[in-house]
Amino acid sequence: MKSQSHKPWNLVAGIFFPIITFFLSAPLVGHALYLFCMRNDHVYYRDFQSTLPRVQTLVSVSLLALFLLSNIGMFLRPRRLSYFLVIVFFIGFAYSGVYKMESRRFSPTPMCFKGEYNNGQGERKTEQYQVVKIEQSQGRLQRVHLRFVNSYALPPYDRRLLPSVKTGCCNRPGNCKLETVNATLWVTRNREGPPLETAMIYDRYGGNADIKDYYDMWRHELSVLYYDCMTCQVRIIKSPRLRKWWQFGVFLSSLTSLFR
């Protein structure tokens, strides 16, 4: 009698739980495909420019594997997946910033960014600036020079002339309606048109900046890229992109806890 009473419940669990698991885990495929397709998207960041595409590929493959294992796990014994779930659990801790020692080994995590900007004693590293020199001819972009120089090599200038350039991606210009940030660059969508009509944004050897509309400096294009690595440290750590990584870590930890 007891075995017969459990048959309807076993039937419901065997049919509906796999279906529910499939629909709940379906967004993993979408996120994996998005990260895989966007892995070659330019992220202008000095230290992680070469590592972010690899991290995105690794995360997309992991999401696909998690999708398959979560659905296969409905038909297999949980013990067969225990080792994988433990690994995913600690990876989720790393991305959410809870497991601080391991978090520094993952490039996009908040602890990794904090490790880059602090030397362990709470002091800032040597300030470096990325200087973008633009050469234009008849309104068309001809050449872009990107280089890093130490802060002491830059001559002083009037901050009032460029209220939002010195602070780079950290200070948003006043009514620009900026939408997002990709670790170094604020992006606005409501400004369209040709690149800046200026020969040089800032010159290492004392040239005067001539910018007609500094709001245009925040459009997502090479010709208007300029940022200060050091003043952006707080905003980078608290940027929306890192918020997504934190949510991803919480999701992994919660999912593995439910599987357990």
From Swiss-Prot:
Domain of life: Eukaryota
Topology feature Cytoplasmic, residues: 1-10, 76-80
Extracellular-side segments: 32-54, 102-260
GO CC terms in record: membrane
Protein family membership: Belongs to the tetraspanin (TM4SF) family.
Name of the molecule in the record: Tetraspanin-14
Lineage: Eukaryota, Viridiplantae, Streptophyta, Embryophyta, Tracheophyta
Keywords, sorted A to Z: Glycoprotein, Membrane, Transmembrane, Transmembrane helix
Sugar-bearing residue positions: N182
Keyword Transmembrane helix tagged: yes
Stated role: May be involved in the regulation of cell differentiation.
Stretches that traverse the bilayer: 11-31, 55-75, 81-101
Membrane topology: Multi-pass membrane protein
Origin species: Arabidopsis thaliana (Mouse-ear cress)
Localisation per UniProt entry: Membrane
InterPro entries named among the record's database cross-references: TET_plant
